[in-house]
C-alpha cells in the first residue's frame, strides 16, 4: 500500500489525530531525502518499535550556510517514495515548499549551546541552530513516541537528544549504527558528489578510524596517537582534514585519553575533492572500542 503523502502542517495534524484516536504508537524518521540504506535501516527499526512509521523529506534551508550546497543537494522524490514503501513507512511528510515550515514572518529558532559548539558546529556557523529548529518543529508537530537518527551524524544526534530532553518533547530518541558500503565508506547522500577517484580516497576516513580502533585494542589510550592514526590515513590519501578529535561521547568535550569503561567518540571530517565527509566511531565504554 502506498504511504500517505502529507504536504502541509494541516495534513500532518489531521493524519496524526487519526493515529491518536486509534491508539497507534508512532515512529518518526526525519530526513532530507535522497534516501539510502542507512535511512531505510531507521525506517525498519521504527517498524519494530512502533505501529506506524512516518518519514519526513525536507531539505531544510536553515541548516545550510551561504556557501554550502543547498541548491545542489541531491533530490529524487519518486525514488524516495519507492524506498519508503519497500521499508514499510506508512506516511511521508514532504512539505510543498520551504514556506510550509518557515512561512513569511517566521522568527523563532532553537539553539542548543554546549554540544553544538565544537566539531562541525565550530566550522558550520548556524548549522545546528537550523537542525535544532526543524527537528523541534517536527517533534512538536508529529508528537512521535520514537524518533530515529543515524550515528554517522553523531554531533547532530547529541544536539537532538539535548533539545528533546530540555524542551520536554517526550520522544524516545534512538541512535542507530552507521550503515556502511562493503568497502567501509559510511553511507551518505553527499557520496553522490564523489568522482570514482574521490570516492576511493574517501575510504581513508574509515581506514583511519579502524587504525585507531586497533591501537586502542592494543592498549593505546592517549588521544594523540589515536588522532595521529586517522591523520596518517587522511594525508596518505591526499584528503584535506577539517578536524580529527577524541571527545566524551555524551558531552562532546575533548579528551586527553580514553579511561577504562569511559564512552568516548573519535570523530573526523575531511574533504575529498570539494565534498566534505564526516565519520566517527565509539571508543571505550560497554562496546569496548565500538565498531566501524
From Swiss-Prot:
Residues at which ATP binds: 32-39, 150-153, 179, 187-190
Reaction(s) the record says it catalyses: (R)-pantoate + beta-alanine + ATP = (R)-pantothenate + AMP + diphosphate + H(+)
Chief subcellular location: cytoplasm
Annotated binding of (R)-pantoate, by residue: 63, 156
One annotated Gene Ontology cellular component of this protein: cytosol
SUPFAM superfamilies assigned to the protein according to its UniProt record, in alphabetical order: Nucleotidylyl transferase
Cell compartment(s), UniProt: Cytoplasm
Keywords: ATP-binding, Cytoplasm, Ligase, Nucleotide-binding, Pantothenate biosynthesis
Organism superkingdom: Bacteria
A GO BP entry: pantothenate biosynthetic process
E.C. designation(s): 6.3.2.1
Residues the record marks as active site: 39
PANTHER family associated with the record: CYTIDYLATE KINASE/PANTOATE-BETA-ALANINE LIGASE, PANTOATE--BETA-ALANINE LIGASE
Primary role: Catalyzes the condensation of pantoate with beta-alanine in an ATP-dependent reaction via a pantoyl-adenylate intermediate.
Assembly, per entry: Homodimer.
Family membership noted in the UniProt record: Belongs to the pantothenate synthetase family.
Further comment found in the protein's record: The reaction proceeds by a bi uni uni bi ping pong mechanism.
Protein name from the UniProt record: Pantothenate synthetase
Lineage: Bacteria, Pseudomonadati, Myxococcota, Myxococcia, Myxococcales
